[in-house]
């Protein structure tokens, strides 16, 4: 019996390796759950183009939008786990379990995490010039007069909202959330001085920072941005446990063979090392971020748990 089991295990391993070696033998779909032209869409197209060149097979980017990015994710979660339907998503996919009452998938269980594409550092932005010369100054002002400081978001439970709440709770101050329909409107209100601060990825904010219309007080990622290296992290600014990462990453349906998951990881990693891809990702505000499938799966699971705790502490209820 022991020999039979050993032979079966060997055959299973050989089959998995053969499947991975044969993959891909037909076009692969890369599902983007948001609109064309977004950072997520651009990143998907840059990497998909390189994967096509590396593997000699077409990687077709499809935008399946709606419901805050959950429709595209649900489509992939329910797709055949054969490696031919890939999802690229963002930090938002780890927030959904805390903010959606009837989520059509389980982020931690319905996906095989492959690897991050990039980290996208979020900046704490204020109008320039501002009465708040530093993040510590902003927090001090908020504590001195509770309720006097407000911040913009693009909707309750969005990544910018969660980032602001992470900072607010760790620093211990009160602030009023003002939701807007989109990032351009939110930034306009900050530039006009009608809103005190706003969290935004470097890519979106950099032109206004360089033009002197906005000032970056800090970055909430664990490391400084290479695009704006003089801007301190929120930890460096003196606020422990205030870091919050924005990232973009790749996923497959949960039961995809591990050899295929590993093959895709290795090919994405290779693609990200190509000079053209590096340059394009950097131009879109992406910072290098690499994890193995196992590391990324663990990271995603911890992020889901952290966001649930954060939403509860901030009084954000599933809708």
Where are these regions (language model features)?
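Extracytoplasmic/secreted envelope proteins and their assembly/folding machinery
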Residues: 44, 48, 52, 73, ...
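An extracytoplasmic/periplasmic, membrane-proximal ligand-sensing/linker region
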Residues: 25-27, 169-171, 236, 258-319
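N-terminal (or domain-start) structured segment
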Residues: 20-110, 148, 172-199, 208, ...
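Sec/Tat signal peptide C-region and signal peptidase I cleavage site
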Residues: 14-20
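Hinge/capping helix and adjacent helix->loop/strand transition within the periplasmic-binding protein
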Residues: 78-84, 98-185, 234-236, 247-280
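A ligand-binding cleft/hinge motif common to bilobed small-molecule-binding domains
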Residues: 93-102, 168-170, 197-231
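Sec-dependent N-terminal signal peptides
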Residues: 4-14
